[in-house]
């Protein structure tokens, strides 16, 4: 089973980033079983650059719940699955840190789509 994941984060210092949006698609190898997405209040200001990049403003997040509210749901979605995503090591690190702040230990195998695309370009014939 696979959990395709994409996080948007607040930006800022390394290991201080907070999740502002979570999107997860659960795939069993044949079909999508479940999808989930939500905005998250990071309780810190989102960098201006991130606001421009994502279109998510601080005002959009003020009334949202914090990650702690979503932690168990997110864990239930991703546990015992391989995490897949674009630059997934970043998302994995941030997710792991957020779960740790909720006193939840989490480990997973990962597949990075950047590496997969690079490999595909090397192995597929060109026209």
Language-model regions: role of each:
Residues 107-117:
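A short, structured active-site edge motif that brings together acidic residues
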């Amino acid at each position: 089973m696979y959990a395709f994941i994409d996080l948007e984060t607040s930006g800022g210092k390394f290991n201080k980033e907070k999740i502002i949006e979570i999107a997860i698609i659960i795939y069993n190898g044949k079909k999508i079983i479940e999808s989930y997405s939500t905005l998250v209040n990071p309780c810190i200001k989102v960098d201006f650059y991130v606001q421009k990049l994502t279109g998510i403003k601080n005002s959009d997040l003020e009334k949202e719940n914090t990650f702690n509210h979503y932690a168990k749901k997110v864990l239930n979605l991703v546990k015992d699955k391989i995490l897949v995503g674009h630059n997934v090591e970043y998302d994995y690190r941030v997710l792991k840190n957020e779960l740790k702040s909720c006193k939840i230990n989490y480990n997973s195998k990962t597949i990075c789509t950047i590496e997969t695309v690079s490999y595909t370009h090397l192995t597929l014939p060109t026209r």
